[in-house]
Amino acid sequence: MRLIKLEQPNCNPCKMVSNYLEQVNIQFETVDVTQEPEVAARFGVMGVPVTILLSDQGEEVNRSVGFKPNELDELLKELR
């Protein structure tokens, strides 16, 4: 499984999610929705940040919207 974070420049909650994931030493991919709007459309993302856990086949398993440490912890449990 893999974790992706959809964000845009100058988004403070996006930075908070990145910092949180980096503190717990989790690898994740970052997608700038202003540069790759097709990714946001694929996952039906209307606002950022959105952190999505994907299966090995690329299917969405779970997601967290905004900076919510409890939701992020749930994603991380599923990732491990």
Curated annotation (Swiss-Prot):
It comes from the Bacteria. Disulfide bonds join 11-14. Keywords: Disulfide bond, Redox-active center. Residues 1-80 form the Thioredoxin domain. Belongs to the thioredoxin family. This is SPbeta prophage-derived thioredoxin-like protein YosR. It comes from Bacillus subtilis (strain 168). The lineage of its organism: Bacteria, Bacillati, Bacillota, Bacilli, Bacillales. The gene is yosR.
